[in-house]
């Protein structure tokens, strides 16, 4: 299930890590009872458009009519209004969320973004809500986790650097116990048994303080280009972590992941570099 980290608050996801799912259909009431159940969908949609995500979750459990009204259209006025209230104008105006097809998906991505309370003291999350900025602090490696982690289901997110990589730039996953700051310039993700990472600088896979081989496993693997979006795929059913570049599946990087709550995470060393992470939901192939 999805487990909220610090900063997720009442807006964290449901059992599948969906975030903006507003409750599951199996839990919805069996019918449309009472005055609310008889209200036309357009009236309900108008009322729902003033509610916050936690309130929408409760509404989705009232009856099937309310559930269908909320989930029948992911671009409805309900989700458009919530998206406009929850997300920064910059996030909606730029191409940060260009791969998300609906307002509901954008709200969900925000609930799964970097946590402002679970990152190194040397980084901050920009006003757009999705981009990490590392301050120019010497001899420090700094990371961040997302607000919500996963212990079941299949999940995908994309991450990209918007500045120099430096000597180490790692993307991957971490438990809540993995440190998000250390002295020196090191591969923080993968430095212990609580995190798994791919160093985009030298293409090494890292876990438990050891190099687990190069990735992707091919001759003359291309180096990461600044601005290039890497898709990360976490499968908690098969206990694997895989990566994609563009439309190319690069392969499974890690197998045998533990049955624990795992969070999308990054670590960086270069001063004033920026890293953006956007949660996509369930992988398209699944």
From Swiss-Prot:
Boundaries of every F-box domain copy: 33-82
Disruption outcome: Homozygous animals die soon after birth due to respiratory distress. Embryos show abnormal innervation of the diaphragm, impaired synapse formation at neuromuscular junctions, and aberrant development of axon fiber tracts in the brain.
SMART domains recorded: FBOX, SPRY
GO terms classed as biological process: anterior commissure morphogenesis; cerebral cortex radially oriented cell migration; cerebral cortex tangential migration; corticospinal tract morphogenesis; DNA damage response; innervation; neuron migration; proteasome-mediated ubiquitin-dependent protein catabolic process
Keyword Ribonucleoprotein included in the entry's annotation: no
Cellular location(s): Secreted; Postsynaptic cell membrane; Presynaptic cell membrane; Nucleus
GO MF annotations, alphabetized: ubiquitin-like ligase-substrate adaptor activity
Gene3D superfamilies: 1.20.1280.50, 2.60.120.920
Pfam families associated with the record: F-box-like (PF12937), SPRY (PF00622)
UniProt keyword annotations, A-Z: Acetylation, Cell membrane, Cell projection, Developmental protein, Membrane, Neurogenesis, Nucleus, Postsynaptic cell membrane, Secreted, Synapse, Ubl conjugation pathway
Domain B30.2/SPRY: 92-284
Keyword set includes Cell membrane: yes
Tissue distribution of the protein: Expressed speciffically in the central nervous system, including cerebellum, medulla oblongata, olfactory bulb, hippocampus, cortex and brain stem.
Pathway participation: Protein modification; protein ubiquitination
Record PTM N-acetylalanine, positions in chain: 2
Cellular component GO terms, alphabetical: cell projection; extracellular region; glutamatergic synapse; nucleoplasm; postsynaptic cytosol; postsynaptic density; postsynaptic membrane; presynapse
Function (record text): Component of E3 ubiquitin ligase complex consisting of FBXO45, MYCBP2 and SKP1. Functions in substrate recognition but plays also an important role in assembly of the complex. Required for normal neuromuscular synaptogenesis, axon pathfinding and neuronal migration. Regulates neuron migration during brain development through interaction with N-cadherin/CDH2 after secretion via a non-classical mechanism. Plays a role in the regulation of neurotransmission at mature neurons. May control synaptic activity by controlling UNC13A via ubiquitin dependent pathway.
Family to which the UniProt record says this protein belongs: Belongs to the FBXO45/Fsn family.
Quaternary data: Forms a complex with MYCBP2 and SKP1. Interacts with HEY1; leading to FBXO45 nuclear translocation. Interacts (via SPRY domain) with CDH2.
Protein name: F-box/SPRY domain-containing protein 1
Record organism: Mus musculus (Mouse)
């Amino acid at each position: 299930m999805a487990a909220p980290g610090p900063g997720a608050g009442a807006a964290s996801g449901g059992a599948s890590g969906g975030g903006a799912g507003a409750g599951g259909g199996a839990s919805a009431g069996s019918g449309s009872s009472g005055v609310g159940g008889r209200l036309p969908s357009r009236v309900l949609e108008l009322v729902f458009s003033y509610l916050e995500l936690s309130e929408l979750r409760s509404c989705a459990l009232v009856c099937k009519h309310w559930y269908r009204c909320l989930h029948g259209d992911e671009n409805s006025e309900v989700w458009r209004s919530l998206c406009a209230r929850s997300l920064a104008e910059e996030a909606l105006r730029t191409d940060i969320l260009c791969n998300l097809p609906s307002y509901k998906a954008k709200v969900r991505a925000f609930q799964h973004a970097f946590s402002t309370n679970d990152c190194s003291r040397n980084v901050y999350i920009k006003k757009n809500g999705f981009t990490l900025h590392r301050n120019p602090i010497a001899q420090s490696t700094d990371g961040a986790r997302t607000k919500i982690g996963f212990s079941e289901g299949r999940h995908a997110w994309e991450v990209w650097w918007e500045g120099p990589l430096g000597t180490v730039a790692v993307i991957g996953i971490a438990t809540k116990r993995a440190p998000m700051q250390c002295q020196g310039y090191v591969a923080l993700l993968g430095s212990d048994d609580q995190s798994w990472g791919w160093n985009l600088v030298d293409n090494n896979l890292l876990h438990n303080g050891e190099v687990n081989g190069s990735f992707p496993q091919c001759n003359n693997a291309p180096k990461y280009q600044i601005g290039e979006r890497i898709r990360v795929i976490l499968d908690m059913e098969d206990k694997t972590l895989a990566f994609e570049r563009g439309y190319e599946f690069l392969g499974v990087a890690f197998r045998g992941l533990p049955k624990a709550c795992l969070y999308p995470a990054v670590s960086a060393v270069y001063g004033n570099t920026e890293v953006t992470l956007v949660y996509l939901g369930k992988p398209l192939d699944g």
